[in-house]
Swiss-Prot record:
This is Biotin synthase. Catalyzes the conversion of dethiobiotin (DTB) to biotin by the insertion of a sulfur atom into dethiobiotin via a radical-based mechanism. Pfam families: BATS, Radical_SAM. Residues 38-256 form the Radical SAM core domain. It comes from the Bacteria. Belongs to the radical SAM superfamily. Biotin synthase family. The gene is bioB. InterPro entries: Aldolase_TIM, BATS_dom, Biotin_synth/BioAB, Biotin_synthase, Elp3/MiaA/NifB-like_rSAM, rSAM. It comes from Klebsiella pneumoniae subsp. pneumoniae (strain ATCC 700721 / MGH 78578). NCBIfam families: bioB. Its EC number is 2.8.1.6. SMART domains: BATS, Elp3. [2Fe-2S] cluster binds at residues 97, 128, 188, 260. GO terms for molecular function: 2 iron, 2 sulfur cluster binding; 4 iron, 4 sulfur cluster binding; biotin synthase activity; iron ion binding.
Amino acid sequence: MAHQPRWTMSQVTELFNKPLIDLLFEAQQIHRQHFDPRQVQVSTLLSIKTGACPEDCKYCPQSARYKTGLEAERLMEVEQVLESARQAKNAGSTRFCMGAAWKNPNDRDMPYLEQMVKGVKALGLESCMTLGTLTDSQAQRLAEAGLDYYNHNLDTSPEFYGNIITTRTYQERLDTLDKVRDAGIKVCSGGIVGLGESVKDRAGLLLQLANLPTPPESVPINMLVKVKGTPLADNDDVDAFDFIRTIAIARIMMPTSYVRLSAGREQMNEQTQAMCFMAGANSIFYGCKLLTTPNPEEDKDLQLFRKLGINPQQTAVLEGDNEQQQRLEQALLTPDTEEYYNAAAL
């Protein structure tokens, strides 16, 4: 792989100061050079272990330190996870992500996690996990099980990070990304807009991500979901244009990465989401629950896709657009009655 040129803070700052209309044009041009602008990759996120997390991430309702009304749950049984994966596939998802609310997995959990990965892969889905800090051996075991992606967000800039989290250092996050990459697993890493950070901090986050030895294959950009009981519950709302600008700059700086709309889509209207797609977003989380917060209902996503002329990216088993659209529509006629998408924010 050719060496990636490193971005400088002055270059990123220049992008943040660029007129939005010009920025969107540049981002869309770059997007079309590397992706089909009418295709969006669809992922489903499941919380395989919910609540009682010992970390103090100020945005997260899963932290045991905050009273958010969330009930803790043990690690799910493997077959429960695989049944959720089957339903996700039937609803049109091509990637199944599994998140656990803890600082790091215990070695006793690894056999179950490996079985989950193998089972998801056997269904023809891409697999992704977000489990916190990993050791070298844990990363290798997940790789040998066939894990495609590992999510571990940087959240914000190194300078602002200490205002949000104190139980895990920024360097720990970078080290985990290195271990995942060394094990041969693709990297999923992004951050959150709306933590109280400055524009310079948003630039710093994207600078860190784009200047990794190999940029993440997948970059989730979250809009803060303010949950009562967390320290950030009263933060100011994120301006939609500021969020769209962040998406566009992520696309420009990481032209071959999937840029994913993650937490916060529920509070975005159709116009904001449409502009995010125009800015270069080409992946979404799809399902009933994201984090322990709402995600747009599947039928609303399908309606928006139709309005914009967007098609969900095809599954691993090749099929025509019409066939996939019909299958997706049929799945949406039977709304999900189990809250198995009660997942941790990525």
